[in-house]
């Protein structure tokens, strides 16, 4: 095997500087279990218990998206008003979940769902819809509430 004298001289020159071979820095493994243990400890301090029978959970966001947990674990501490939902969420549009949600809703929620469907068709964001309905409800509800400014409570009928 022919050896190039220039390469050999270059290698000998650089070998005087090197003590060891090239080292690849090992990647640091970040364990997510540590975060879970902290969560479990915090829930243990609150005396949270596992709630059975919850098959799925949906969290409605202000931007119209829904966080859907298909297989969910629920732990709750009602005394401290704390509930933990664990699992892998899927971000979906509300239109994808309407067939699954309809049987679970009561009569009072169907009106809200109808308004939400109209609002989606109109192209508004749910945030705009919520502020508009809150303002309309405040205006409509203000008719039967008397003004009590600069009056005594006993004088107002």
From Swiss-Prot:
The keyword Cytoplasm applies. GO terms for biological process: protein transport. Gene3D superfamilies: Nascent polypeptide-associated complex domain. GO terms for cellular component: cytosol; nascent polypeptide-associated complex; nucleus. It is found in: Cytoplasm; Nucleus. SMART domains: NAC (SM01407). Residues 33-98 form the NAC-A/B domain. Residues 1-28, 124-157 are annotated as: Disordered. Part of the nascent polypeptide-associated complex (NAC), consisting of EGD2 and EGD1. NAC associates with ribosomes via EGD1. Component of the nascent polypeptide-associated complex (NAC), a dynamic component of the ribosomal exit tunnel, protecting the emerging polypeptides from interaction with other cytoplasmic proteins to ensure appropriate nascent protein targeting. The NAC complex also promotes mitochondrial protein import by enhancing productive ribosome interactions with the outer mitochondrial membrane and blocks the inappropriate interaction of ribosomes translating non-secretory nascent polypeptides with translocation sites in the membrane of the endoplasmic reticulum. This is Nascent polypeptide-associated complex subunit beta.
